């Protein structure tokens, strides 16, 4: 399922670069010491006048995060969050015994009416097989929602997520941006993260200028 990107990468996609010089506008000194091209960077939400792709670099420490930019021609490989929502892939992972991976496996046992994936530290660990997960690690989840989704189905998902063996948070990705599922189910509105900022909305599928 690894794809060479033919279209613009989306937030949370993991991308590999053809050289260290492909990372632009990085100021953090630790990146040069710890990051190498065998490790992916994660696409983040931002806009650039030069049509560069906004990315973030993860370090070995939780506080080590660096924002930068890359050009499309320097991306050589892409993995989407949905790649990891695969039971066989999860069962074969060296990290299969970790609670977030066990939690993800349990979610694959249900035929959900949408595409979903794994982001954050668990997605990064699955992609790199770097043992960064531990007993208290969270599971970050993403639901693709190009159209409004059935509320009852989302409540069923949230109920299943609440029973997982680790803390799990779900972001719902719409054409307008992304919002926290638990916030929207609880309040009827949520903070929508867009490439131009954040706005509070009850209609997260509607495109508006932030």
Language model segments and positions:
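Helical scaffold of the NTase/Pol beta-like nucleotidyltransferase catalytic core
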Residues: 1-121, 154, 158-166, 170
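Conserved NTP-donor binding/palm subdomain of two-metal-ion nucleotidyltransferases/polymerases, i.e.
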Residues: 27, 40, 181-210
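Active-site nucleotide-donor binding segment shared across nucleotidyl transfer reactions
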Residues: 105-139, 143-149
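Short, solvent-exposed amphipathic alpha-helical segments in soluble enzyme
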Residues: 133, 157-161, 187
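Short, charged/polar "capping" segments at the starts of alpha-helices
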Residues: 150-152, 179
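Conserved catalytic core of two-metal-ion nucleotidyltransferases
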Residues: 162-194
